[in-house]
Design a protein with these regions (language model features):
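As written
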Residues: 18, 51-58
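A short, hydrophobic beta-strand element within the central beta-sheet of small alpha/beta folds
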Residues: 32-46
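Active-site beta3 strand of CheY-like receiver
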Residues: 2-13
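A Lys-centered signature of the CheY-like receiver
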Residues: 63
Length: 259
């Protein structure tokens, strides 16, 4: 079944939690871009928030909240979904080039959604593997103001172009400026691995898993990199976390127990 709005509590008793449901919906591509997913939780710890936001819910509400707050958030999200309807429809159908074209048309139509339009255009260009066009878009956005989302997008485009050192330069600058965005660490580790600097990549992933210990895919990546580095103590520690996080997760695998 397809739903327009999903409001899901993090704590659902036995079985999956709200984050794992969103994780599986993203992984199986069962959640349409046009749908709204709001994650609700009573906890607001740093690691919990980081873990939840990694799977990009449309909004994140901490209890207690008022009906007025919920209504305002829903109203704003519905307006945004309607504005980007053609873009989301193209993304849902895997028509990434068309999605990029639709987003480009919308960039100057509503100042409120200008940045969101650029983000969607860049995302669609990356997904359609138009890496040079994506790099140009993000570079132009960075020239106006050095925004983090544009820097990350530029780095992802550079990785797509296999310009590893250039990507590392952009990402390292973000880290030097104190970024907490975990995409930065994931992309940086990917670039370092491509250059054969596995030890550096492992250190980057270890740092990221301290900030967000609930990200199972990153823990899996760390375990595999540590194993390749013959750092069996670190690998065992990461695999133990993976097994624990894998309970009720769509990413659970018996192979993790053998790691």
């Amino acid at each position: 079944n397809q739903y327009d709005i999903i409001i899901c509590d993090y704590s659902l008793g036995k079985g999956k939690n709200g984050q794992q449901i969103l994780e599986e919906l993203r992984f199986t591509q069962s959640l349409k871009h046009r749908a709204i997913y709001i994650l609700v939780t009573a906890e607001a710890t740093r690691s919990m928030v980081f873990g939840a936001l990694e799977y990009k819910p449309d909004d994140y509400l901490t209890k207690p909240f008022t009906p007025v707050l919920l209504q305002n958030r829903l109203d704003n999200l519905i307006l945004e979904k309607q504005f980007f309807e053609k873009v989301y429809e193209a993304l849902d159908n895997g028509h990434y080039e068309a999605a990029a074209e639709h987003a480009a048309v919308l960039v100057n139509q509503n100042r409120r959604y200008r940045v969101a339009s650029l983000k969607l255009q860049g995302q669609a260009l990356l997904q359609s593997q138009q890496f040079e066009l994506a790099r140009q878009l993000y570079h132009e956005a960075m020239e106006h103001r050095r925004q983090e989302w544009a820097c990350i997008g530029c780095a992802r485009a550079l990785i797509g172009l296999q310009k590893w050192s250039s990507a590392i330069h952009v990402l390292s600058e973000l880290i030097d400026h104190g970024t907490e965005n975990l995409q930065v660490f994931d992309c940086l580790a990917e670039a370092e691995l491509a250059l054969g600097r596995n030890g550096v990549a492992q250190a980057i992933l270890e740092r990221a898993t301290v900030s967000s210990p609930y990200g199972i895919l990153r823990q899996i990546n760390l375990a595999e990199v540590a194993s390749a580095n013959n750092d069996y103590l670190a690998a065992e520690k990461a695999f133990r976390r993976v097994i624990k996080l894998g309970i009720n997760s769509c990413h659970d695998s018996h192979e993790h127990s053998l790691g």
